[in-house]
Amino acid sequence: QELIEALRKIAPFVIIDCGSYIANDILSAVSLLECDSALRLANCDLKSISYLSSQLQLLQNSKWDTDKQYKVASNVKPNHSVDHMAGAMGSVSFQLPYSEELEEQYLSGNLLADMTLKNSRPFRKEIEKIAKEVFGC
């Protein structure tokens, strides 16, 4: 908690990439308790849906303010059903579409490169919507 408070004093926004097994990760648990807002990303595949379903009882605990949680269906491909994700997560606030360009950047270890391809435009637009909603910019 002290770390998060110190970070808030030196930066206007603090982004913490939490682990997915919150019960055994003290930084993630404290971050979720102290955050102004949280993005919960989950892929639209059976493995992610199953894991998320197993964690929902913990994530919906009264300690975690569910009103400040934005639920994001991530890596959505045309053949995926976001309805299944909405069933597992509750309402989905955002849908991050699959981007081949992003996958190539990930595989090459170059995630900080600009995304310039036309077929990445839907992904970039959704990221802009998330930034506007969560950070107000």
Regions found by a protein language model. Give the residues of each.
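P-loop/Walker-type NTP enzyme "switch/lid" segment
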Residues: 1-9, 103-110
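Switch II (G3) loop of P-loop NTPases
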Residues: 2-28
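Well-ordered beta-strand positions
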Residues: 13, 37, 91-94
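Conserved beta-strand segments of the P-loop GTPase G domain that flank and frequently precede/overlap
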Residues: 15-17, 39-44, 69-75
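Conserved Switch II/interswitch segment of TRAFAC-class P-loop GTPases
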Residues: 21-22, 35-53
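Conserved C-terminal guanine-recognition region of P-loop GTPase G domains, centered on the G4
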Residues: 52-65
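Beta-strand-loop-alpha "switch" segments that mediate conformational coupling across diverse proteins
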Residues: 75-79, 83-116
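NTP-binding/hydrolysis catalytic cores, primarily Walker-type P-loop NTPases
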Residues: 108-137
